[in-house]
């Protein structure tokens, strides 16, 4: 499959220039591709130096190895500090109907204002993992809607995210073979 037909994301944590480059080079080899669509800085670090990240990202971008830079699990203030040095295009964060924190704490508002895309990891949240009071409350609303719209619970949970004005892109996966 050609690179143009499959968006690729890569995550790493050590934010030194040499480690960023090594991570990109190793990922390109393992993925057998020429470039990465989005390089994600996987989580905030108190040791991150935005100038170093910016310079190495710009070098990799000039070389055609990376197209966009994003972050994962960064707060609005952490994104702002990094954006003083380099432009961010994505923040991958936990967001679901059972974990609405970024919707109400200003994170998605900040991202929308800064034109930073949102990717949601664990987009189904704890809905299928536990039988909590929260799940029971949500089920009272979702089950009738699933019947009305002839869809499954997971489809409706994903639709809830996708319909958000922040245009949240769910990152889906499973640890259960039966859910595939």
What are these regions (language model features)?
Residues 44-180:
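Beta/alpha (TIM)-barrel catalytic core signal, keyed to glycine-rich beta->alpha loops juxtaposed to Asp/Glu
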Residues 4, 20, 36-38:
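Metal-dependent phosphodiesterase/phospholipase catalytic core, i.e.
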Residues 13-31, 52, 75-81, 103:
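Short, acidic/polar
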